[in-house]
Amino acid sequence: MEQSFPKRPFRTHGGAHVPHHKNTAHTETRVMPPPDEITLPMTQHIGAPCVPCVKKGDHVYVGTKVADSDAYVSVPIHSSVSGTVKEIKKVIMPGGQAVDAVIITSDGLMEHDPAVCPPPEIKTKQQLADAARASGLVGLGGAGAFSGLKLNVPPDKKIDTLIVNVAECEPYITSDHREALENGKNVLAGIYKIKEILDVHRVIIAIEDNKPDAIEALTRIADDPKMDPNDEVRVLKLHASYPQGAEKVLVQAATGRKVPAGGLPADVGCLVMNIGSVSFLASYMRTGMPLTMKRVTVDGSAVQNPQNVIVPIGTKIREVMEFCGGYTEEPQKLIMGGPMMGVAVTTDELPVLKQNNGLLAFGAEEARLLEPTDCIRCGRCVAACPMNLVPAKLEKYAERKDVEMLKKLDIMTCMECGCCAFSCPAKRRIVQAIRLGKYYVKKEAAKK
């Protein structure tokens, strides 16, 4: 059945108007030279960790597979430099867990693996999902979800709409914005391959209205009869509101459909993919080169020259910052990701991971943590919650460790977007409490 295109976005509940701080939107992306050494942790995605398939002393190329897993929800990891495996050791991840990591010393040559070649012709959903897995692709929007799982649509689900996510609602982050401007034709090539294999006849490129140049560029390409002969791809301009790029929020804004609690976009006939993931798939199908590089926004008041950088995965944060001119002052807060949903880290010796789309360094003023006061029951957190939850109650019962009430209040539906804490006049640390509450619920479930 023919699908109509929305003329304007549908209304969604909640959200917050956060400051944009898109300082690097109009700065051309630079490519960073290879570092002397990279660190590749075995957990760079949602799902089972990988196991090293190389050993100390092995020579590797750019694109050589260094780790994999037999688990279904997992993706292989590839070297982003040519050189020699120095060692395999435990490293601490941003979340605090210790995992194995492959350490590779670069020879500076960046020689591509001779075994790398374009995948065989892809004609089926399973072949597309297998190719996505073999490429090492995870969602490049920041979540790190296994892209092959999305593309391997169950037989009982019919996808009629592909939504390309260019919302990029997090403050500071502009890597998707630059992808749209610099690789628009590649994005359209990826769209058409996915569209053809999944038999989708409506593609919505959803982008916030604070990116007028990217909207113009994508619209120009999508309106080109040579690129879109059947007029099945349209650009939808969204209101700039956080968290517009969250999957369930985006599906509702772009189609008017509501993804059920605990459900997926496929349950309502939608597939959501980040623009970077779509563009990468097009490149992979053309060249066979797996995911080894990542465009990262480097910004914050403590960064000398904020910009977008193509970084070899596994490069230390410190080296990326040095490439951007170093620090203007001693950073008081380092964040991997955006300021709303990113992870604050204690050292810049951590490596850039596949899902990292931002590295932020802030001085003392921006890093200042306000002291919370008593909840005044104003209801702003309820109005802001895009999932229609009651964050104040979730915080209260999390502090009490009341698992039954937390389950009744549907705590696991929370996406931890931070709208509640951002909107709270009492500066309550609501998201922190909810994360603890989720831990208590999972711990209780594990006992049964």
Can you describe what each PLM-predicted range is?
Residues 55-68, 87:
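Short, well-structured beta-strand-loop connectors
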Residues 83-85:
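Conserved hydrophobic positions within beta-strands
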Residues 200-317, 323-328:
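Hydrophobic alpha-helical positions that pack around
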Residues 112, 139, 162-176, 302:
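Gly-rich Lys/Arg/Thr-decorated short loops/hinges at beta-loop-alpha junctions or inter-strand turns
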Residues 1-53:
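N-terminal, Lys/Arg-enriched amphipathic/low-complexity engagement segments
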Residues 181-197:
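Histidine-anchored nucleotide/phosphate-binding helix
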Residues 87, 92-145, 150, 154-156, ...:
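Acidic low-complexity segments
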Residues 356-372, 382, 386-448:
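Ferredoxin-type iron-sulfur electron-transfer modules in oxidoreductases and energy-metabolism complexes
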